[in-house]
């Protein structure tokens, strides 16, 4: 029954989508992350029993979908730090992460730290009422990325003021 379930919602903008929200179930310790921590991998295993088997796909998924918004990943990880113990991460793609949580979280923290530390990047800010501005901003970010430049998408409605100040202040373009 739902009596023992209490959900806490964490804003995690730009973890593939500008409106991403994590949902933590205090009753079960499950964190539902939408696309974050996901991977395009299919097997009969429901859980991450063999980390070696899924690690390459986990990294590829991060590099393609999460890495371009490494600073947003770091902000989401900070928000996760305020949660009680997480015993499972339920992702939108791939196996449930349960057996090696500290490993997967550490990978995200390390990779995002490397990508965001001292690198020059362009900040592409947008405010989308009907979904058109976010699509054009993603196209602009994709074009910037084709020039081997780093880019950070910034949803002005979903980014807290301190994070916005830091993102824009550190941006080179």
Briefly describe each language-model feature range.
Residues 1:
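Active-site HxH/HxHxD metal-binding segment of metal-dependent hydrolases
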Residues 4-100:
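Metallo-beta-lactamase
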Residues 101-173:
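N-terminal beta1-alpha1-beta2 submodule of the flavodoxin-like/Rossmannoid cofactor-binding fold
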């Amino acid at each position: 029954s739902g009596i023992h379930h209490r959900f806490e919602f964490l804003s995690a903008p730009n973890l593939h989508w500008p409106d991403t929200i994590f949902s933590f179930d205090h009753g079960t310790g499950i964190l539902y992350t939408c696309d974050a921590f996901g991977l395009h991998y299919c097997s009969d295993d429901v859980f991450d029993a063999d980390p070696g088997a899924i690690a390459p796909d986990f990294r590829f998924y991060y590099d393609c979908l999460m890495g371009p918004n490494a600073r947003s990943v770091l902000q989401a990880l900070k928000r996760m730090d305020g949660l009680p113990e997480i015993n499972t991460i339920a992702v939108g793609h791939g196996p449930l992460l349960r057996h090696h949580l500290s490993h997967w979280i550490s990978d995200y923290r390390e990779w995002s730290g490397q990508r965001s530390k001292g690198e020059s990047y362009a900040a592409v800010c947008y405010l989308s009422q009907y979904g058109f501005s976010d699509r054009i901003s993603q196209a602009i970010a994709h074009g910037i990325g084709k020039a081997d430049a780093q880019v950070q998408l910034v949803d002005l409605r979903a980014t807290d003021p301190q994070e916005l100040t830091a993102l824009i202040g550190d941006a080179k373009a």
